[in-house]
Amino acid sequence: FRDLSGDAINYAAEKDDIGRYNADDMLIENCSFYRLLGLPINIYRGGSDESTAGPYVTIRHCTFVDCCNKERGSVMRLIGPQVLTVENCNFDNSGRGGATIRLDEATWEKVRIANCNLWNSGRMVTTTAQAIQGKMYNIRPAYTNAEAYDYVPVRGSELEKLSIGLRKN
C-alpha cells in the first residue's frame, strides 16, 4: 500500500455497537505501507455481547514508513479485538502526531504486542497496558532498496537479526 490519502485496511463499519464486526479471523502479514495519510489498519468491534467471540486479529512482519503523522492520528486503530497479536512490525517515521498503535482492550481479552521497532514514531496507547509484552526497539532501519519500495531490512542488519519488519519472499 503506498501513497494513499485514505485508509488502507478498514474493517470498522460497525455503527450499532452490538458486536457485529466486519471480519472474524484476520491475518495481515508481510505487508508494507508507505506514505499513507489515513489509517493503515483500522479494526473496530463494539458492544459487550459475550456471545460473539471475535474478531481474531494477527498482524506480523509489516513495515510502516511515513504513515498517519497527523495530529492525534494512529498507524493502527484497534478497538475491541478479543484476540490480537501484533509482532515483528517496524514503524519508521509513523504515527508521530499521535500513536503508532491505539488499542482499546478489556482486561479479559487475549492481546499481545511484542518485538516491534519504533523509529521516530509515536507512542503506543493501550487501555490496560497488559498488551505490551517483551522488548520494543528504537533502531534506525536500513532497507534493501527503499527507492523501489523494497522495505526488507538490509541483510545482516539489527532488524533482520531480530526478525522485525518485512521478510524476503
Model-derived regions: residue spans:
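Extracellular beta-rich repeat passengers
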Residues: 1-169
